[in-house]
Amino acid sequence: MANHKSTQKSIRQDQKRNLINKSRKSNVKTFLKRVTLAINAGDKKVASEALSAAHSKLAKAANKGIYKLNTVSRKVSRLSRKIKQLEDKI
């Protein structure tokens, strides 16, 4: 247990932030899963729309410091490449 009021407060703040960050990360993962499911189903239009929504969520998460910018870029790039491969197959 923390001995100082300031450390007690910082522990409370950390716990609060941890819950918020978990929620935001979960929300982003849900959007990424929608893109992946659309890609696996072979539906290019739905996948593109889902990617645009997921990209927005990822950018906001990066802005909040939940994900690093390179991580977001990598995720978007990989999903975009998979959608592009769907176009090539058709």
Swiss-Prot record:
Compositionally biased region (Polar residues): 1-10
Q: Where is this region: Disordered?
A: 1-25
- Write down the InterPro entries for this protein, in alphabetical order: Ribosomal_bS20 (IPR002583), Ribosomal_bS20_sf (IPR036510)
UniProt feature coiled coil, ranges: none
**Pfam (any one):** Ribosomal_S20p
Identify a single GO molecular function assigned to this protein. Answer: structural constituent of ribosome
* SUPFAM superfamilies for the chain: Ribosomal protein S20 (SSF46992)
Q: Name one GO cellular component term.
A: small ribosomal subunit
Give GO BP annotations, semicolon-separated.
translation
Q: Which UniProt keywords apply?
A: Ribonucleoprotein, Ribosomal protein, RNA-binding, rRNA-binding
Q: What does this protein do?
A: Binds directly to 16S ribosomal RNA.
Can you tell me which family this protein belongs to? Belongs to the bacterial ribosomal protein bS20 family.
Q: Which PANTHER family match?
A: 30S RIBOSOMAL PROTEIN S20, SMALL RIBOSOMAL SUBUNIT PROTEIN BS20C
Protein name (Swiss-Prot/TrEMBL): Small ribosomal subunit protein bS20
Native organism: Orientia tsutsugamushi (strain Ikeda)
